[in-house]
A protein has these predicted regions:
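Alpha-helical residues within the helix-turn-helix
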Residues: 30, 47-48
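Amphipathic alpha-helical dimerization/coiled-coil segments
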Residues: 75-104
Length: 104
């Protein structure tokens, strides 16, 4: 599973779905500061790739619940780990730069 095609907004969307499965696309778009059109595009892509599925709520069939599939959970985990590794590498680089400047 290559994550070269995934962006930070995909990780944020996967995390939000994991926390707020019953949120509407409008709620998710507002939470992530994305346009509704962009959120819809990202959501369709994640569903097409099998990372997210939808279920209609029994008590209100017009409402949708977004669910992470096992693949979606695995992707969220991998993207989170990759994000943390990137941030730790950035931190280490900044720390080296500061130490170099202090030693001059």
């Amino acid at each position: 599973m290559s994550n070269n095609n995934f962006k930070q907004e995909d990780l944020e969307l996967l995390r939000k779905i994991g926390k707020k499965a019953e949120a509407s696309q409008r709620d998710l778009a507002n939470d992530l500061n994305l346009s509704l059109g962009k959120l819809n595009y990202c959501m369709k892509s994640l569903m097409r790739k099998g990372f997210v599925k939808i279920n209609r709520l029994k008590e209100n069939p017009s409402k949708i619940k977004y669910i992470l599939t096992q693949e979606g959970i695995a992707l969220r985990t991998k993207l989170t780990i990759d994000f943390m590794k990137k941030k730790m590498a950035e931190y280490d680089e900044l720390k080296r730069e500061l130490e170099t400047k202090e030693n001059k």
